[in-house]
């Protein structure tokens, strides 16, 4: 595999970007601050499982835009759908057929979505589910799990996980103390802690926000019985269970994590994959709850771009690809091969790691403990990950520049890509 140590055009673009874009990036996670700094790689184009940067280097991509690009870059079925929709106009400001078609397709895949509403992002979707839960229950408090990131609305930037934690600031300036008092945090996979919180505050809690499978301090699965107990305890106190499936929906199975785990929340927030690479969010749930949303009810939510034809067309096309036979079985097969190859490389070179993997998503932690909560992820060696990230990048393997993030496989990755990646891991571990 060729080396990619020289990236003069990326360095030049980063210098220019810092003069006109805050921090030189349009999302903090895109900077390399958490991995030792320097200019991020500027990409020219994506094709299948690969990126090509502005200096002509090719990378095997496991970032997948932090999850949405599950079918690989520039899949022709999706780009054709976007092109066809765009020819008829980019934005109407009126209802149209595609939003109905897509809503039906989501409902067929995720039965808990008795009614659906589209938004422009996962952040908007989560933000609105909380508003609706408050309207439905008449309560104000929200419970979330430490380290789980639910977007950048003020309320959710409390113990917020991968985004702020990557930069070493677990909360955000500008979030008021009054807002912070509306959120109660508790460790993921610790049901007794949650039980105690609800015993004390339950009559004031509107909802609990849950990643059914965590994706924002790495891939962390719930302990047996954890989600079932959350449902039971929450409903005993008259509060609602909201699943944030912005990362998990259509990642591990056709549908959502709730189908995989055989459990049902009251409401669900969606994003990322369902847009096929375009901006999107959606939320839905029980009909009696969703009827509190305007124009039927008092909980207001709107969006000029919400349900736009291009995003609807891209989402439908993406799901058409994912519902084909064997997609998730192949994710699991390649994911298992990648996991085993990394573990064998670590053993060969005496590097201490653990891996959490589910199907085609995994996280490599530089620690000797099994990570089941945010504190475990936090204890993983940041400096070691930063060195590993740079060594992989220099060999043409693109990972997320944060120890908290996952590696995502796409339908475009091949066995050859996995073999090349394992070879790069061996060379990187030999230098750690």
Swiss-Prot record:
GO terms for molecular function: glutamate-1-semialdehyde 2,1-aminomutase activity; pyridoxal phosphate binding; transaminase activity. Its cofactor is pyridoxal 5'-phosphate. It catalyses: (S)-4-amino-5-oxopentanoate = 5-aminolevulinate. The modification N6-(pyridoxal phosphate)lysine is found at residue 272. GO terms for cellular component: cytoplasm. InterPro entries: 4pyrrol_synth_GluAld_NH2Trfase (IPR004639), Aminotrans_3 (IPR005814), PyrdxlP-dep_Trfase (IPR015424), PyrdxlP-dep_Trfase_major (IPR015421), PyrdxlP-dep_Trfase_small (IPR015422). Keywords: Cytoplasm, Isomerase, Porphyrin biosynthesis, Pyridoxal phosphate. Its EC number is 5.4.3.8. It is an enzyme of class 5 (isomerase). It holds the Pfam family Aminotran_3. It comes from the Bacteria. SUPFAM superfamilies: PLP-dependent transferases. Pathway: Porphyrin-containing compound metabolism; protoporphyrin-IX biosynthesis; 5-aminolevulinate from L-glutamyl-tRNA(Glu): step 2/2. One of its GO terms (biological process) is protoporphyrinogen IX biosynthetic process. Homodimer. Belongs to the class-III pyridoxal-phosphate-dependent aminotransferase family. HemL subfamily. NCBIfam families: hemL, PRK00062.1, PRK12389.1. This is Glutamate-1-semialdehyde 2,1-aminomutase 1. It comes from Exiguobacterium sibiricum (strain DSM 17290 / CCUG 55495 / CIP 109462 / JCM 13490 / 255-15). The lineage of its organism: Bacteria, Bacillati, Bacillota, Bacilli, Bacillales.
